[in-house]
Amino acid sequence: MVEAIVEFDYQAQHDDELTISVGEIITNIRKEDGGWWEGQINGRRGLFPDNFVREIKKEMKKDPLTNKAPEKPLHEVPSGNSLLSSETILRTNKRGERRRRRCQVAFSYLPQNDDELELKVGDIIEVVGEVEEGWWEGVLNGKTGMFPSNFIKELSGESDELGISQDEQLSKSSLRETTGSESDGGDSSSTKSEGANGTVATAAIQPKKVKGVGFGDIFKDKPIKLRPRSIEVENDFLPVEKTIGKKLPATTATPDSSKTEMDSRTKSKDYCKVIFPYEAQNDDELTIKEGDIVTLINKDCIDVGWWEGELNGRRGVFPDNFVKLLPPDFEKEGNRPKKPPPPSAPVIKQGAGTTERKHEIKKIPPERPEMLPNRTEEKERPEREPKLDLQKPSVPAIPPKKPRPPKTNSLSRPGALPPRRPERPVGPLTHTRGDSPKIDLAGSSLSGILDKDLSDRSNDIDLEGFDSVVSSTEKLSHPTTSRPKATGRRPPSQSLTSSSLSSPDIFDSPSPEEDKEEHISLAHRGVDASKKTSKTVTISQVSDNKASLPPKPGTMAAGGGGPAPLSSAAPSPLSSSLGTAGHRANSPSLFGTEGKPKMEPAASSQAAVEELRTQVRELRSIIETMKDQQKREIKQLLSELDEEKKIRLRLQMEVNDIKKALQSK
């Protein structure tokens, strides 16, 4: 029959569960997988979480029965003594081997899962084994669980030898007590053995007495019993004896001071919140910052006005008027294990990490204290160095991986994070008026590089060339039209410079109204139209090895239906030589290395002039089309701007109405 003692209160959540309280004994337990056991308490049978209780060995429950049979023959006691002496030595050696590997807690740690141990600075843990890298399994205060290995430091062999010597003293005192029980019931002899062995023997004998065995018959049935549990584990059965009603001896009622402090901290923890920052002035003081949560250890320090506490794994004193106490139920849930999941639903364990602090709503803090409490030992303490070399190392990082607990169906936590989501790309710019035709003026006529493909610069309109155009009221005539031509020379080339094509209006000057519109749409409102008085065109010298060719047919499509503008070059900066030529749609390029057959100088010059005039007229039509298009776009932009202004005004009015409504409330 398996029995267990309740260590934590649990309120039943379903009809088939048991409501258990601390100290109660659950009997007829049937162990099941999944974290839930079935047992009986107060005549009622139901389920309860297994991590809220601690199992009691059968040998411990048989002890009270031994008190009822003191009339056994005396010849059994010597035989029991001989067996006891041999078994005690063997088991003491085994215990020494098992307790050979121990570790001491260097940093405090609060459990994040049910199968983890709560560590406090100074606790001694018996290491069971290394389950996973960074996580060990051990026994602390009778509870077996996992703990991070970088929060502890292993003890040297001296502590192991001390534990073995304590076990030897325990066995010797047990033999003396058994001898006393044979003669007079064991009261006087047990007291003598305690006095002879001192406090160590007293503390070692304490667990067996607490379990209600009695003085005279404490080791009567010892050959049948096992003694595998440590002293710390046996001390945890004190609440059981309170329910049974055994009266403890006066010598066993005074536990060790370190364990008293540990138990008091486990049962009730006090926390305080820092309301004013304080920089440590001595080695034994804590540096606290506003908002920190400090665990109180001792309020009754030697110096009045100073408390002892723990923060980030470091213990020290701090002024009590720099903090305020938190209510007793603060972080109450962190001290008790979580409810295990139902047996059918596995639990995915979360990553082990430091506990998140609970941030309270900030309020107006009281005035900072004017002075610190007086410390009597302040003169004796050395002044603290400016560098924090004497501080304890910070709490190490918790290992990222946690082993699977042996008794639950929980899964191991994922080891890697999902890949990071890529950045959202910037959307391409859209044109609001894509249906309107785009006329490319500078693609073929304003760049000065006529042998380049027109598709590479179809969307670029060079308007800077129009700033250098000076309007003229008279038509310009070429000065070489009446000049005799030399025989054997080719006609003027159609190659133009960027400055020569700056103005589309070469021969016909526009009216003042048209001039003004051209200034607004193409010159970016740079200069007034009245300042344009003349137009100057610079034409480059014709090359000797090239002849005039008709324009490329792609110019018409790129320009929105109009032909590409072309003009000739001449040595004079204030004149131009013009000619006419037919448009050939099958011409593959604007210029080629092959020229036309040689013509008469007069005929070729006249043809070039006519061709240039035709192209100038086409340029003017293109400019007019661009003017109309830009006028339409400007009007559309203005209308959209007006609509946006109206929408903004409506939104502003709605915001004002909402503000007034809120103020009225």
UniProtKB/Swiss-Prot annotation:
GO cellular component, one term: GABA-ergic synapse
Residue ranges of every copy of the SH3 domain listed in the record: 1-58, 98-157, 267-328
Compositionally biased tracts (Polar residues): 469-484, 535-546
Signal peptide start and end residues: none
Primary subcellular site in the record, as a coarse category: cytoplasm
Post-translational modification: Monoubiquitinated by CBL and CBLB after EGF stimulation; probably on its C-terminus.
A molecular function GO annotation: ubiquitin protein ligase binding
Keyword rRNA-binding listed: no
List of residues that carry Phosphothreonine: 254
Region of interest (Disordered), ranges: 159-200, 328-444, 467-610
Compositional bias (Low complexity): 177-195, 491-510, 564-582
Keyword hit for Ubl conjugation: yes
In-chain residues carrying the UniProt-annotated modification Phosphoserine: 156, 159, 183, 230, 436, 509, 511, 521, 587
Distribution of this protein across tissues and organs: Ubiquitously expressed. Also expressed in some cancer cell lines.
PROSITE patterns for the chain: SH3
Membrane disposition: Peripheral membrane protein
Keywords: Apoptosis, Cell junction, Coiled coil, Cytoplasm, Cytoplasmic vesicle, Cytoskeleton, Endocytosis, Host-virus interaction, Membrane, Phosphoprotein, Repeat, SH3 domain, SH3-binding, Synapse, Synaptosome, Ubl conjugation
Start-end of Basic and acidic residues biased regions: 355-390, 517-531
Compartment annotation: Cytoplasm; Cytoplasm, Cytoskeleton; Cytoplasmic vesicle membrane; Synapse, Synaptosome
Involvement in disease: Immunodeficiency 61: An X-linked recessive primary immunologic disorder characterized by recurrent infections due to impaired antibody production. Affected individuals have normal numbers of circulating B and T cells, but B cells have an intrinsic defect in antibody production. Disease severity is variable and onset is in early childhood.
Function, in words: Adapter protein involved in regulating diverse signal transduction pathways. Involved in the regulation of endocytosis and lysosomal degradation of ligand-induced receptor tyrosine kinases, including EGFR and MET/hepatocyte growth factor receptor, through an association with CBL and endophilins. The association with CBL, and thus the receptor internalization, may be inhibited by an interaction with PDCD6IP and/or SPRY2. Involved in regulation of ligand-dependent endocytosis of the IgE receptor. Attenuates phosphatidylinositol 3-kinase activity by interaction with its regulatory subunit.
Oligomer status and interactors: Can self-associate and form homotetramers. Interacts with CD2, F-actin capping protein, PIK3R3, GRB2, EGFR, MET, BLNK, MAP3K4, PDCD6IP, SPRY2, ARHGAP17, ARHGAP27, MAGI2, CRK, BCAR1, SOS1, ASAP1, ARAP3, HIP1R, SYNJ2, INPP5D and STAP1. Interacts with E3 ubiquitin-protein ligases CBL and CBLB, but does not interact with CBLC. Two molecules of SH3KBP1 seem to bind through their respective SH3 1 domain to one molecule of CBLB. The interaction with CBL or CBLB and EGFR is increased upon EGF stimulation. The interaction with CBL is attenuated by PDCD6IP. Interacts (via SH3 domains) with ARAP1. (Microbial infection) Interacts (via SH3 domains) with Chikungunya virus non-structural protein 3 (via C-terminus); this interaction plays a role in initiation of viral replication.
Designated name of the protein: SH3 domain-containing kinase-binding protein 1
The species this protein was found in: Homo sapiens
Phylogenetic placement of the source organism: Eukaryota, Metazoa, Chordata, Craniata, Vertebrata
